Protein backbone atom coordinates (compact mmCIF):
# COMPACT_ATOMS: atom_id res chain seq x y z
CA UNK A 1 0.00 0.00 0.00
CA UNK A 2 1.58 3.25 -1.16
CA UNK A 3 0.02 5.42 1.56
CA UNK A 4 1.14 2.99 4.30
CA UNK A 5 4.70 3.14 2.99
CA UNK A 6 4.45 6.92 2.89
CA UNK A 7 3.32 7.02 6.54
CA UNK A 8 6.18 4.73 7.58
CA UNK A 9 8.62 6.95 5.70
CA UNK A 10 7.29 10.05 7.46
CA UNK A 11 7.70 8.34 10.83
CA UNK A 12 11.31 7.48 9.96
CA UNK A 13 11.97 11.07 8.88
CA UNK A 14 10.52 12.39 12.13
CA UNK A 15 12.62 9.97 14.18
CA UNK A 16 15.79 10.88 12.28
CA UNK A 17 15.10 14.56 12.81
CA UNK A 18 14.68 14.06 16.55
CA UNK A 19 17.96 12.14 16.78
CA UNK A 20 19.83 15.00 15.14
CA UNK A 21 18.54 17.60 17.56
CA UNK A 22 20.91 18.62 20.31
CA UNK A 23 20.23 17.23 23.76
CA UNK A 24 18.73 19.66 26.20
CA UNK A 25 17.18 21.85 23.52
CA UNK A 26 13.81 23.28 24.40
CA UNK A 27 10.86 22.75 22.09
CA UNK A 28 7.76 24.83 22.57
CA UNK A 29 4.58 26.03 20.90
CA UNK A 30 3.76 28.85 23.25
CA UNK A 31 0.26 30.25 23.27
CA UNK A 32 -1.32 27.38 21.37
CA UNK A 33 -1.09 23.93 22.89
CA UNK A 34 1.09 25.13 25.76
CA UNK A 35 4.78 24.80 26.54
CA UNK A 36 6.80 21.64 26.86
CA UNK A 37 10.48 21.05 27.60
CA UNK A 38 12.43 17.93 26.81
CA UNK A 39 12.56 15.52 29.73
CA UNK A 40 15.58 15.44 32.03
CA UNK A 41 16.23 13.74 35.35
CA UNK A 42 15.93 17.02 37.21
CA UNK A 43 12.98 18.26 35.19
CA UNK A 44 10.46 15.51 34.43
CA UNK A 45 7.77 15.87 31.79
CA UNK A 46 4.99 18.23 32.79
CA UNK A 47 1.41 17.99 31.63
CA UNK A 48 0.45 20.73 29.21
CA UNK A 49 -2.09 23.19 30.55
CA UNK A 50 -4.30 24.47 27.77
CA UNK A 51 -5.25 28.11 28.07
CA UNK A 52 -7.99 29.28 25.79
CA UNK A 53 -7.60 33.01 25.37
CA UNK A 54 -10.97 34.34 24.17
CA UNK A 55 -9.53 37.53 22.77
CA UNK A 56 -7.02 35.77 20.59
CA UNK A 57 -8.10 35.33 17.01
CA UNK A 58 -7.07 32.23 15.09
CA UNK A 59 -4.01 32.76 12.98
CA UNK A 60 -2.83 35.76 14.99
CA UNK A 61 0.71 34.40 14.81
CA UNK A 62 0.51 33.96 11.06
CA UNK A 63 3.84 33.95 9.29
CA UNK A 64 4.51 36.89 6.99
CA UNK A 65 3.92 36.29 3.31
CA UNK A 66 6.92 35.03 1.41
CA UNK A 67 8.82 37.90 -0.18
CA UNK A 68 8.54 37.92 -3.96
CA UNK A 69 6.52 34.71 -4.09
CA UNK A 70 6.09 34.78 -7.84
CA UNK A 71 9.85 35.22 -8.30
CA UNK A 72 10.52 32.18 -6.11
CA UNK A 73 8.17 30.02 -8.16
CA UNK A 74 9.49 31.37 -11.46
CA UNK A 75 13.12 30.76 -10.50
CA UNK A 76 12.34 27.20 -9.42
CA UNK A 77 10.65 26.52 -12.77
CA UNK A 78 13.61 27.94 -14.70
CA UNK A 79 16.25 26.05 -12.70
CA UNK A 80 14.39 22.75 -13.00
CA UNK A 81 14.36 23.09 -16.81
CA UNK A 82 10.93 21.52 -17.19
CA UNK A 83 10.56 22.52 -20.83
CA UNK A 84 7.30 23.68 -22.39
CA UNK A 85 5.28 22.92 -19.25
CA UNK A 86 6.97 25.86 -17.50
CA UNK A 87 5.84 28.32 -20.18
CA UNK A 88 2.58 30.21 -20.19
CA UNK A 89 -0.18 28.06 -21.73
CA UNK A 90 -1.54 29.20 -25.06
CA UNK A 91 -5.21 29.73 -25.75
CA UNK A 92 -7.15 26.70 -26.97
CA UNK A 93 -6.73 26.29 -30.72
CA UNK A 94 -8.80 23.17 -31.32
CA UNK A 95 -11.55 21.10 -29.80
CA UNK A 96 -10.79 18.50 -27.18
CA UNK A 97 -10.68 14.85 -28.18
CA UNK A 98 -14.11 13.27 -28.23
CA UNK A 99 -14.82 10.06 -26.36
CA UNK A 100 -14.68 8.14 -29.63
CA UNK A 101 -11.33 9.69 -30.61
CA UNK A 102 -9.85 9.04 -27.17
CA UNK A 103 -10.89 5.38 -27.16
CA UNK A 104 -9.54 4.91 -30.69
CA UNK A 105 -6.20 6.42 -29.63
CA UNK A 106 -6.12 4.11 -26.59
CA UNK A 107 -6.65 1.08 -28.82
CA UNK A 108 -3.65 2.13 -30.92
CA UNK A 109 -1.61 2.67 -27.75
CA UNK A 110 -2.47 -0.77 -26.40
CA UNK A 111 -1.45 -2.31 -29.72
CA UNK A 112 1.92 -0.50 -29.65
CA UNK A 113 2.54 -1.50 -26.04
CA UNK A 114 1.84 -5.16 -26.80
CA UNK A 115 4.25 -5.07 -29.73
CA UNK A 116 7.00 -3.46 -27.66
CA UNK A 117 6.54 -5.86 -24.77
CA UNK A 118 6.78 -8.80 -27.19
CA UNK A 119 9.99 -7.44 -28.74
CA UNK A 120 11.57 -6.97 -25.31
CA UNK A 121 10.92 -10.60 -24.45
CA UNK A 122 12.76 -11.81 -27.57
CA UNK A 123 16.57 -12.02 -27.99
CA UNK A 124 18.05 -8.69 -29.03
CA UNK A 125 19.10 -8.32 -32.64
CA UNK A 126 19.90 -5.25 -34.76
CA UNK A 127 16.53 -5.62 -36.48
CA UNK A 128 14.58 -5.89 -33.21
CA UNK A 129 16.47 -2.92 -31.73
CA UNK A 130 15.56 -0.77 -34.74
CA UNK A 131 11.95 -1.96 -34.53
CA UNK A 132 11.82 -1.12 -30.81
CA UNK A 133 13.11 2.38 -31.48
CA UNK A 134 10.54 2.94 -34.21
CA UNK A 135 7.67 1.62 -32.08
CA UNK A 136 8.77 3.68 -29.06
CA UNK A 137 8.75 6.83 -31.18
CA UNK A 138 5.26 5.98 -32.42
CA UNK A 139 4.12 5.30 -28.84
CA UNK A 140 5.52 8.61 -27.64
CA UNK A 141 3.84 10.51 -30.47
CA UNK A 142 0.50 8.79 -29.85
CA UNK A 143 0.61 9.73 -26.15
CA UNK A 144 0.60 13.44 -27.19
CA UNK A 145 2.54 14.46 -24.08
CA UNK A 146 4.57 17.10 -25.91
CA UNK A 147 1.59 18.94 -27.38
CA UNK A 148 1.51 22.50 -25.99
CA UNK A 149 -0.38 23.25 -22.81
CA UNK A 150 -3.71 24.88 -23.54
CA UNK A 151 -3.96 23.48 -27.05
CA UNK A 152 -7.34 22.09 -26.02
CA UNK A 153 -9.42 21.80 -22.86
CA UNK A 154 -8.64 19.28 -21.54
CA UNK A 155 -5.18 18.58 -22.95
CA UNK A 156 -5.12 15.61 -25.39
CA UNK A 157 -2.97 13.57 -22.97
CA UNK A 158 -5.43 14.29 -20.17
CA UNK A 159 -8.31 13.19 -22.41
CA UNK A 160 -6.64 9.78 -22.69
CA UNK A 161 -6.25 9.54 -18.93
CA UNK A 162 -9.88 10.44 -18.29
CA UNK A 163 -10.72 6.84 -19.23
CA UNK A 164 -10.02 3.94 -16.88
CA UNK A 165 -8.31 2.12 -19.77
CA UNK A 166 -5.91 5.03 -20.13
CA UNK A 167 -5.07 5.09 -16.44
CA UNK A 168 -4.38 1.36 -16.30
CA UNK A 169 -2.07 1.62 -19.31
CA UNK A 170 0.29 4.13 -17.68
CA UNK A 171 2.39 1.66 -15.60
CA UNK A 172 3.11 -0.40 -18.72
CA UNK A 173 3.95 2.74 -20.71
CA UNK A 174 6.36 4.04 -18.06
CA UNK A 175 8.43 0.85 -18.32
CA UNK A 176 8.86 1.37 -22.06
CA UNK A 177 9.95 5.02 -22.00
CA UNK A 178 13.36 6.58 -21.50
CA UNK A 179 14.17 8.52 -18.33
CA UNK A 180 13.72 11.82 -20.19
CA UNK A 181 10.34 10.79 -21.57
CA UNK A 182 9.15 9.56 -18.17
CA UNK A 183 10.14 12.90 -16.63
CA UNK A 184 8.31 14.77 -19.40
CA UNK A 185 5.18 12.69 -18.72
CA UNK A 186 5.42 13.41 -14.98
CA UNK A 187 5.80 17.11 -15.76
CA UNK A 188 2.67 17.09 -17.91
CA UNK A 189 0.71 15.20 -15.25
CA UNK A 190 1.63 17.76 -12.60
CA UNK A 191 1.00 20.73 -14.90
CA UNK A 192 -2.47 19.38 -15.76
CA UNK A 193 -3.25 17.87 -12.37
CA UNK A 194 -6.49 19.65 -11.55
CA UNK A 195 -7.97 18.89 -14.98
CA UNK A 196 -7.73 15.11 -14.41
CA UNK A 197 -11.16 13.65 -13.71
CA UNK A 198 -9.92 11.91 -10.54
CA UNK A 199 -9.11 15.36 -9.14
CA UNK A 200 -11.67 17.57 -10.88
CA UNK A 201 -14.67 15.40 -9.92
CA UNK A 202 -13.37 14.25 -6.53
CA UNK A 203 -15.50 16.71 -4.52
CA UNK A 204 -18.73 15.49 -6.16
CA UNK A 205 -17.85 11.86 -5.46
CA UNK A 206 -16.90 12.65 -1.88
CA UNK A 207 -20.13 14.55 -1.30
CA UNK A 208 -22.12 11.63 -2.69
CA UNK A 209 -20.45 9.24 -0.24
CA UNK A 210 -21.45 11.48 2.68
CA UNK A 211 -25.04 12.19 1.63
CA UNK A 212 -26.08 8.93 -0.01
CA UNK A 213 -26.80 7.05 3.28
CA UNK A 214 -29.17 9.79 4.43
CA UNK A 215 -32.85 9.78 3.69
CA UNK A 216 -34.58 12.79 2.12
CA UNK A 217 -31.25 14.24 0.95
CA UNK A 218 -30.46 14.22 -2.76
CA UNK A 219 -26.77 13.62 -3.58
CA UNK A 220 -25.19 15.79 -6.30
CA UNK A 221 -24.69 12.83 -8.66
CA UNK A 222 -26.45 9.54 -9.34
CA UNK A 223 -25.38 6.17 -7.98
CA UNK A 224 -24.20 5.11 -11.44
CA UNK A 225 -22.07 8.25 -11.82
CA UNK A 226 -20.63 7.75 -8.33
CA UNK A 227 -19.69 4.15 -9.14
CA UNK A 228 -17.91 5.21 -12.32
CA UNK A 229 -16.12 8.04 -10.53
CA UNK A 230 -15.04 5.76 -7.69
CA UNK A 231 -13.62 3.28 -10.20
CA UNK A 232 -11.80 6.10 -11.99
CA UNK A 233 -10.31 7.51 -8.77
CA UNK A 234 -9.14 4.06 -7.66
CA UNK A 235 -7.56 3.41 -11.06
CA UNK A 236 -5.78 6.77 -10.93
CA UNK A 237 -4.45 6.15 -7.41
CA UNK A 238 -3.32 2.58 -8.06
CA UNK A 239 -1.87 3.10 -11.53
CA UNK A 240 -1.01 6.70 -12.40
CA UNK A 241 -0.31 8.15 -8.96
CA UNK A 242 1.69 5.09 -7.93
CA UNK A 243 4.03 5.58 -10.91
CA UNK A 244 4.27 9.31 -10.24
CA UNK A 245 5.34 8.70 -6.64
CA UNK A 246 7.89 6.08 -7.70
CA UNK A 247 9.46 8.51 -10.18
CA UNK A 248 9.41 11.39 -7.67
CA UNK A 249 11.53 9.26 -5.33
CA UNK A 250 14.36 9.34 -7.90
CA UNK A 251 14.48 13.12 -8.49
CA UNK A 252 16.94 15.70 -7.20
CA UNK A 253 15.91 18.49 -4.85
CA UNK A 254 16.14 21.06 -7.64
CA UNK A 255 13.68 19.09 -9.76
CA UNK A 256 11.42 18.54 -6.73
CA UNK A 257 11.34 22.31 -6.16
CA UNK A 258 10.48 22.82 -9.81
CA UNK A 259 7.70 20.23 -9.70
CA UNK A 260 6.13 21.83 -6.62
CA UNK A 261 6.42 25.26 -8.23
CA UNK A 262 4.81 23.89 -11.40
CA UNK A 263 1.93 22.40 -9.41
CA UNK A 264 1.23 25.81 -7.84
CA UNK A 265 1.75 27.75 -11.07
CA UNK A 266 -0.61 25.69 -13.23
CA UNK A 267 -3.21 24.56 -10.66
CA UNK A 268 -5.29 25.84 -7.78
CA UNK A 269 -3.16 24.10 -5.17
CA UNK A 270 -5.66 24.52 -2.32
CA UNK A 271 -8.39 22.81 -4.38
CA UNK A 272 -5.97 20.02 -5.27
CA UNK A 273 -5.01 19.57 -1.62
CA UNK A 274 -8.67 18.99 -0.75
CA UNK A 275 -8.57 15.76 -2.73
CA UNK A 276 -7.02 12.42 -1.83
CA UNK A 277 -4.80 12.35 -4.98
CA UNK A 278 -3.64 15.91 -4.29
CA UNK A 279 -2.64 15.15 -0.70
CA UNK A 280 -0.78 12.04 -1.90
CA UNK A 281 1.15 14.03 -4.51
CA UNK A 282 2.08 16.82 -2.08
CA UNK A 283 3.14 14.25 0.53
CA UNK A 284 5.36 12.49 -2.02
CA UNK A 285 7.09 15.76 -2.97
CA UNK A 286 7.69 16.85 0.64
CA UNK A 287 8.77 13.37 1.70
CA UNK A 288 11.35 13.16 -1.08
CA UNK A 289 12.67 16.64 -0.25
CA UNK A 290 13.13 15.73 3.42
CA UNK A 291 14.83 12.43 2.54
CA UNK A 292 17.29 14.36 0.35
CA UNK A 293 17.80 16.95 3.06
CA UNK A 294 18.70 14.22 5.55
CA UNK A 295 20.99 12.37 3.13
CA UNK A 296 24.43 12.04 4.67
CA UNK A 297 26.34 10.88 1.58
CA UNK A 298 25.30 13.63 -0.86
CA UNK A 299 23.42 16.47 0.87
CA UNK A 300 21.85 19.16 -1.35
CA UNK A 301 23.77 22.33 -2.09
CA UNK A 302 23.00 25.48 -0.11
CA UNK A 303 21.36 27.20 -3.09
CA UNK A 304 19.11 24.17 -3.67
CA UNK A 305 17.98 24.25 -0.05
CA UNK A 306 17.35 27.99 -0.20
CA UNK A 307 15.27 27.57 -3.32
CA UNK A 308 13.32 24.70 -1.76
CA UNK A 309 12.43 26.71 1.32
CA UNK A 310 11.34 29.65 -0.83
CA UNK A 311 8.95 27.46 -2.84
CA UNK A 312 7.77 25.71 0.32
CA UNK A 313 6.98 29.10 1.85
CA UNK A 314 4.72 29.86 -1.10
CA UNK A 315 2.95 26.52 -0.62
CA UNK A 316 2.49 27.11 3.10
CA UNK A 317 1.04 30.58 2.56
CA UNK A 318 -1.41 29.39 -0.09
CA UNK A 319 -2.64 26.48 2.01
CA UNK A 320 -2.90 28.42 5.28
CA UNK A 321 -4.35 31.69 3.95
CA UNK A 322 -7.69 32.69 5.50
CA UNK A 323 -7.60 29.77 7.93
CA UNK A 324 -8.09 27.15 5.20
CA UNK A 325 -5.86 24.40 6.62
CA UNK A 326 -8.72 22.56 8.40
CA UNK A 327 -10.56 22.28 5.07
CA UNK A 328 -7.91 19.84 3.91
CA UNK A 329 -9.40 17.25 6.28
CA UNK A 330 -12.20 15.00 5.06
CA UNK A 331 -14.01 15.34 8.40
CA UNK A 332 -14.18 19.13 8.02
CA UNK A 333 -15.50 18.94 4.47
CA UNK A 334 -17.99 16.20 5.38
CA UNK A 335 -19.43 18.39 8.13
CA UNK A 336 -19.96 21.17 5.58
CA UNK A 337 -21.90 18.79 3.32
CA UNK A 338 -24.38 17.85 6.03
CA UNK A 339 -27.79 19.51 6.17
CA UNK A 340 -28.56 21.59 9.22
CA UNK A 341 -29.21 19.61 12.38
CA UNK A 342 -27.68 16.27 11.32
CA UNK A 343 -24.97 14.77 13.52
CA UNK A 344 -22.41 13.44 11.07
CA UNK A 345 -20.33 11.76 13.71
CA UNK A 346 -23.16 9.54 14.95
CA UNK A 347 -23.97 8.70 11.33
CA UNK A 348 -20.38 7.73 10.69
CA UNK A 349 -20.42 5.16 13.48
CA UNK A 350 -23.10 3.07 11.75
CA UNK A 351 -21.47 0.31 9.64
CA UNK A 352 -22.10 0.66 5.92
CA UNK A 353 -22.90 4.36 6.11
CA UNK A 354 -20.63 7.38 5.66
CA UNK A 355 -16.87 6.68 5.36
CA UNK A 356 -14.81 6.52 8.54
CA UNK A 357 -13.59 10.09 9.02
CA UNK A 358 -10.56 8.97 11.03
CA UNK A 359 -9.31 6.72 8.23
CA UNK A 360 -10.01 9.40 5.62
CA UNK A 361 -8.18 12.04 7.69
CA UNK A 362 -5.05 9.94 8.24
CA UNK A 363 -3.26 10.91 4.97
CA UNK A 364 -3.89 14.59 5.79
CA UNK A 365 -2.36 14.25 9.27
CA UNK A 366 0.56 12.56 7.53
CA UNK A 367 0.92 15.56 5.21
CA UNK A 368 0.67 18.00 8.13
CA UNK A 369 3.55 16.17 9.81
CA UNK A 370 5.66 16.61 6.67
CA UNK A 371 4.70 20.28 6.53
CA UNK A 372 5.74 20.69 10.18
CA UNK A 373 9.11 19.04 9.53
CA UNK A 374 9.93 21.57 6.80
CA UNK A 375 8.35 24.61 8.49
CA UNK A 376 10.24 27.25 10.44
CA UNK A 377 9.19 28.25 13.95
CA UNK A 378 6.69 30.92 12.90
CA UNK A 379 5.11 28.57 10.36
CA UNK A 380 4.86 25.85 13.00
CA UNK A 381 3.04 28.29 15.26
CA UNK A 382 0.55 29.05 12.49
CA UNK A 383 0.16 25.34 11.79
CA UNK A 384 -0.66 24.48 15.40
CA UNK A 385 -2.86 27.54 15.89
CA UNK A 386 -5.00 26.76 12.85
CA UNK A 387 -5.30 23.07 13.73
CA UNK A 388 -5.75 23.60 17.46
CA UNK A 389 -9.48 22.83 17.47
CA UNK A 390 -8.96 19.80 15.24
CA UNK A 391 -6.24 18.46 17.55
CA UNK A 392 -8.22 19.00 20.74
CA UNK A 393 -11.47 17.59 19.34
CA UNK A 394 -9.69 14.40 18.29
CA UNK A 395 -8.07 13.95 21.69
CA UNK A 396 -11.34 14.66 23.49
CA UNK A 397 -13.25 12.20 21.27
CA UNK A 398 -10.61 9.53 21.88
CA UNK A 399 -10.80 9.98 25.65
CA UNK A 400 -14.60 9.90 25.62
CA UNK A 401 -14.56 6.73 23.53
CA UNK A 402 -12.11 5.12 25.92
CA UNK A 403 -14.27 6.00 28.92
CA UNK A 404 -17.46 4.83 27.22
CA UNK A 405 -19.08 1.60 28.32
CA UNK A 406 -19.94 0.69 24.73
CA UNK A 407 -17.93 -2.24 23.34
CA UNK A 408 -15.29 -1.21 20.82
CA UNK A 409 -12.79 -3.14 18.70
CA UNK A 410 -9.31 -3.47 20.25
CA UNK A 411 -7.34 -0.30 19.67
CA UNK A 412 -10.22 1.55 18.03
CA UNK A 413 -10.05 4.39 20.52
CA UNK A 414 -6.39 4.99 19.61
CA UNK A 415 -6.96 5.87 15.94
CA UNK A 416 -7.59 9.55 16.64
CA UNK A 417 -4.62 9.76 19.01
CA UNK A 418 -2.37 8.10 16.45
CA UNK A 419 -3.49 10.57 13.80
CA UNK A 420 -2.88 13.58 16.03
CA UNK A 421 0.50 12.25 17.10
CA UNK A 422 1.63 12.13 13.47
CA UNK A 423 1.69 15.93 13.63
CA UNK A 424 2.60 16.40 17.28
CA UNK A 425 5.62 14.09 17.11
CA UNK A 426 7.00 16.20 14.26
CA UNK A 427 6.78 19.16 16.68
CA UNK A 428 8.40 17.19 19.56
CA UNK A 429 5.04 17.03 21.32
CA UNK A 430 2.71 14.18 22.25
CA UNK A 431 -1.01 13.89 22.83
CA UNK A 432 -0.32 12.42 26.28
CA UNK A 433 1.02 15.80 27.36
CA UNK A 434 -2.29 17.55 26.74
CA UNK A 435 -4.84 17.81 29.54
CA UNK A 436 -8.42 18.85 28.85
Predicted region positions:
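Compositionally biased, intrinsically disordered low-complexity regions enriched for acidic
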Residues: 1-2
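Charge-patterned, phosphorylation-rich low-complexity C-terminal interaction regions
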Residues: 6-436
Amino acid sequence: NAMLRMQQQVERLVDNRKKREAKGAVSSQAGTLGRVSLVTANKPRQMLQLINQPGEAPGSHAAPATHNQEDAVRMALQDAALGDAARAPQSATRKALTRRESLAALERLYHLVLQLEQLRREPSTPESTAAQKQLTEALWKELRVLEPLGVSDPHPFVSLLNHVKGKKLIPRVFRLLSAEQALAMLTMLIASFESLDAVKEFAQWEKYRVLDPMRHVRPPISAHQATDLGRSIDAFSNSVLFQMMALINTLSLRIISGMLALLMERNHVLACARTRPGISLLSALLSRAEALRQAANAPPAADELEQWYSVLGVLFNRLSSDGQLPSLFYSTRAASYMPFGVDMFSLGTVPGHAPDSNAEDEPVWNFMALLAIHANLSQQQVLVQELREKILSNILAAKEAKASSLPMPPGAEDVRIRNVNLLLHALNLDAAQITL
